[in-house]
Amino acid sequence: MNQSLLVTKRDGRTERINLDKIHRVLDWAAEGLNNVSVSQVELRSHIQFYDGIKTSDIHETIIKAAADLISRDAPDYQYLAARLAIFHLRKKAFGQFEPPALYHHVVKMVELGKYDNHLLEDYTEEEFKQMDSFIVHDRDMTFSYAAVKQLEGKYLVQNRVTGEIYESAQFLYILVAACLFSNYPRETRLDYVKRFYDAVSTFKISLPTPIMSGVRTPTRQFSSCVLIECGDSLDSINATSSAIVKYVSQRAGIGINAGRIRALGSPIRGGEAFHTGCIPFYKHFQTAVKSCSQGGVRGGAATLFYPMWHLEVESLLVLKNNRGVEGNRVRHMDYGVQINKLMYTRLLKGGDITLFSPSDVPGLYDAFFADQDEFERLYVKYENDDSIRKQRVKAVELFSLMMQERASTGRIYIQNVDHCNTHSPFDPVVAPVRQSNLCLEIALPTKPLHDVNDENGEVALCTLSAFNLGAIKTLDELEELAILAVRALDALLDYQDYPIPAAKRGAMGRRTLGIGVINFAYWLAKNGKRYSDGSANNLTHKTFEAIQYYLLKASNELAKEQGACPWFNETTYAKGILPIDTYKKDLDAIVNEPLHYDWEQLRESIKTHGLRNSTLSALMPSETSSQISNATNGIEPPRGYVSIKASKDGILRQVVPDYEHLKDAYELLWEMPNNDGYLQLVGIMQKFIDQSISANTNYDPSRFPSGKVPMQQLLKDLLTAYKFGVKTLYYQNTRDGAEDAQDDLAPSIQDDGCESGACKI
């Protein structure tokens, strides 16, 4: 290697290249790692050096060289590359490797307008010194390379135009904790700050993108998911559209319920005009969703919901596919089809489904969610009433069209609205659940807006986070983590701003949280269980029982201290009804694990003191934040031992946790013979989870005789999910062979919808 090359320093001076210095940094970064070769990294990077190269470019080149060596056989290169990247990142942020004192850092950032000045108003210099003593900067060294790149790209406070970075990860964690607990009493708050900081910086609790990137800055909107219901009037349609624009501009993912909109040809003003139908209004919503791009990267994302029995359903089911013309397609949203038991019964009995315009059948639309017996009574009555406009379709044909579109686009989702209301934390008579959100894990009550400042409407918000099952040794640890997650997210509801009165009203009244899990696949592998063979059923029951029990207990304790949420009386919890009372009893045939916690004592305590939060749990996808914790995505099986995610910094490779020891214990997605085992586990989780679950179905056409997935199989899985009480189905993934090219490298699914961290964590 040519020792006479000149390099340009960060301050503009030039000097001879110092290869020893580079070697020392590499040695430091490789310490304690297995199966990594410093000389290999040096060889790969030296050939890219040139005369006059900047020291920062040398650093980037070495990092890239190490990252390119990450593989199944040498997973530790992900830590070598990460340490080099942290070194580089701190040099960029602080001008040196050692971070500054926390107090001086905060003062400087507040002056620059990067941090919210409430930090300096709420905490004294002395308290900042105490917080500084809580920080363990060495935890930066536990990140994988993919995590550091995600931090740089999405989470650290920066100038997105110049690329300047202003902080390191441990400052992010301690300041999120400081902001969330800033209104707690002086004598206890630093204790909570320390405990919360420790939980998030050791990856035991995973936070969603809006919280990681936004809390501590002057922008205060951190809800991941927003649910907006539209009425059947022009005022309501316009109010919905305005609400969408307001929330899309603030990084949220949107769920739209447009099921009330009357069908094509319905009379308007007593027949003076006839209605243009749903599609023009769906296009209007699509334009609103795509109006604000996040940092110029891409527009927002939404899932729009409608009932299966809507008169226009056959035109609505095909809106996403790539046939048809611009006029009859609305491709840039995803869709959720709402179904109930009566529809499934008609399918099983070979009957018809009758389609109506909601405007022609008084009471039917509301009963669809609030009262299944009343829905059936009205539905049959309207079927037999010749004066009402309707269309009959064979149930099997309608279901087949829906499943065919789900298979070809992957993005037609399912909501079983009866399960969402019969196994729900809300009393369907006063607070029915009429829609879900972008990623199908939220189930909250909404009311249509009549104008954007309508105080009587209700826009539902959900604030998310997750427990990292890979970072805990026993389920007992969940008790402390539940206390921290519930308290932090509950405090966030008071800390954030609300662009729309109807959103603030609902958030303050219901105080809904959605706490889920990441790293479930690692938890199964670690415990020697598999998705597909039933071996994980009892463990899953035990795990999710613990999660829901500890979350309810934490919210109940918080209610004793700060009062129950104002609309607690609209929940089933207020009547002493718990998830263990209303689950689908078909699950008892596939799991025989007893209950392990004292639910009866908890029931009494909830009846007496209430809950601070109407909902506590939801199982969301976690593509991005699971990379920070080096965890597997949500409850999903991994697609490969090494996943690849394309980012603006090139390819990020991530190896499944503890690969060397557990490679034979992981069950990969396409090794699962069918969806049965997975759907059973989702049903068992849903027994305890009070909202819903982003559950996917997966098909490998090569497993079937004709190389095609038979319709019968698709319908069977849909019915299996319903049988086990599954509330919602999210993506349908079809294996196309492309991802098998490199044996263990699996592309991570690119879901434009949730990239911003909207509705997922």
Which ranges hold each PLM region?
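Core nucleic-acid recognition elements
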Residues: M1-Q3, V36-I174, A178, D191-Y197
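Catalytic alpha/beta core of large soluble enzyme barrels
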Residues: T124-L151, L440-T446, L489, L493-D494, ...
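Alpha-helix capping and helix-loop boundary segments enriched in small/acidic/polar residues
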Residues: R13-I17, E164-E167, E187-D191, I211-T217, ...
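Polar, glycine-rich mid-to-C-terminal structural blocks
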Residues: V318, G327, R331-T409, V417
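Internal maturation/activation junctions in enzymes
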Residues: A199, A482-K504, M508, K529-S622, ...
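Function-dense linear segments that define catalytic or interfacial modules
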Residues: V157, E164, F171-R189, V193, ...
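Terminal amphipathic helices with adjacent charged low-complexity linkers/tails
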Residues: Y77-G113, K149, I339-K341, C420-D451, ...
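A glycine-rich phosphate-binding loop feature that marks nucleotide/adenosyl-phosphate handling sites
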Residues: R44-S45, I63-A65, Y79-F87, A199, ...
